[in-house]
C-alpha cells in the first residue's frame, strides 16, 4: 500500500475539503492511504501527488475520490433508538397534527429526508417503519428522500440489492424474508412495496444552487462529525431552513448541537433525544 508524505497529506486534505467539505485532521493519514491506494493502482499512479494532479484534470476520477473518502459504515436500524422514537413518538404525533389540519379528501403529506444516506440502509429502515404503521396507503402522500455526496453510494441505494452480510447487520431472518426477495446465493433485493417509498439523489449540502424543499423529519446522523465547526454551523443553518416549523431533527447518538447552533430545542422520549425548531429563532 502506498504511503502518503506529510506534504501530500496537507495538499490532499485541502483538496478533499474543497471538493466535498470533509475535514481530515492530522492523524488521518491511514484513512487516505487505505481508501485511495486502490485508486492509485487502478489509475496507474505511483504516488498520491500523481493521482492528485490527475484528478485535478479528470472529473470522473474526482468523483471516485469523493466516493472513496466519504464512504461510511452503515447498517439497517443502526443504533435502534432513533427508529424507536420515529415509530412510537414522532410519526404518530406528526400524523395526528397533519390529519387535523388536512382538507377533506386531501392526502396527508409526510416528507422525510436522510442526509448522508450512504448505501440506503437508513432510508429503507424508515420505509419499513412507515409500512409497519400502515402509512403506505393512498391516504398518505409520502416521500422519503435519501441524499449523499457519493455517486457510488446513491447508485447502490437506488438498486436496493444487499448481501447476506449487509442484511445480517441489523435484521433478523424473519425481517429479511419480510422485506426482501432472494435473488441468488448471497444477494437480496428490497421488495417493491418498500422501494417505492424511497427516492435517492446525489447532493452536496454546501452547494447553494441545490434546493431540496421542506421536510417534516430530517435524519442527519454522523454527518457533522466530518466537517469543521464552521461548516457544521452552516450545515445546521441549512437544515433549519429545510425543516417545517413543527418538524423533527434526529442526529447521531454521540453528537450534540450545543456548540453548533441554537436553532433547535432538544426533546426527550424514553432513551431518545430528538430536536425541534426553536420558535425564538424562526423567521
Report each predicted region and the residues it spans.
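Conserved AdoMet
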Residues: 1-113
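Extended basic-aromatic, gly/pro-enriched interface segments that bind polyanionic ligands
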Residues: 115, 135-219, 223-227, 231, ...
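A short glycine-rich, Lys/Arg-flanked "PGG" loop and its adjoining helix->strand segment in the class I
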Residues: 233-245
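Conserved beta-strand signature within the Rossmann-like core of class I S-adenosyl-L-methionine
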Residues: 246-253
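Core SAM-dependent methyltransferase catalytic element
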Residues: 258-283
Amino acid at each position: 500500500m502506498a504511503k502518503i508524505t506529510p506534504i501530500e497529506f496537507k495538499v490532499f486534505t485541502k483538496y478533499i475539503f474543497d471538493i466535498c467539505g470533509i475535514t481530515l485532521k492530522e492523524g488521518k493519514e491511514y484513512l487516505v492511504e487505505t481508501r485511495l491506494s486502490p485508486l492509485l493502482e487502478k489509475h496507474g499512479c505511483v504516488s498520491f501527488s500523481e493521482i492528485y494532479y490527475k484528478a485535478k484534470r479528470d472529473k470522473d476520477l474526482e468523483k471516485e475520490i469523493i466516493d472513496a473518502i466519504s464512504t461510511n459504515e452503515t447498517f439497517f436500524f443502526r443504533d435502534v433508538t432513533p427508529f424507536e422514537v420515529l415509530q412510537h413518538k414522532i410519526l404518530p404525533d406528526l400524523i395526528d397534527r397533519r390529519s387535523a389540519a388536512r382538507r377533506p379528501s386531501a392526502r396527508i403529506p409526510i416528507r422525510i429526508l436522510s442526509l448522508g444516506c450512504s448505501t440506503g440502509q437508513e432510508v429503507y429502515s424508515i420505509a419499513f417503519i412507515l409500512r409497519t404503521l400502515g402509512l403506505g396507503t393512498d391516504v398518505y402522500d409520502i416521500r422519503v428522500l435519501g441524499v449523499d455526496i457519493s455517486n457510488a453510494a446513491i447508485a447502490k441505494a437506488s438498486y436496493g440489492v444487499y448481501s447476506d452480510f449487509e442484511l445480517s447487520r441489523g435484521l433478523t431472518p424473519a425481517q429479511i424474508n419480510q422485506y426482501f426477495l432472494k435473488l441468488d446465493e448471497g444477494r437480496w433485493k428490497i421488495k417493491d412495496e418498500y422501494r417505492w417509498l424511497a427516492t435517492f439523489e446525489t447532493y452536496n449540502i454546501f452547494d447553494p444552487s441545490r434546493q431540496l424543499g421542506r421536510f417534516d423529519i430530517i435524519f442527519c446522523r454522523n454527518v457533522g462529525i466530518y466537517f469543521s465547526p464552521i461548516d457544521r454551523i452552516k450545515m445546521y443553518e441549512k437544515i433549519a431552513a429545510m425543516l417545517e416549523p413543527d418538524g423533527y431533527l434526529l442526529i447521531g447518538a454521540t453528537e450534540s448541537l450545543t456548540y453548533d447552533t441554537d436553532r433547535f430545542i432538544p426533546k426527550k422520549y424514553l432513551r431518545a433525544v430528538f430536536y425541534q425548531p426553536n420558535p425564538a429563532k424562526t423567521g
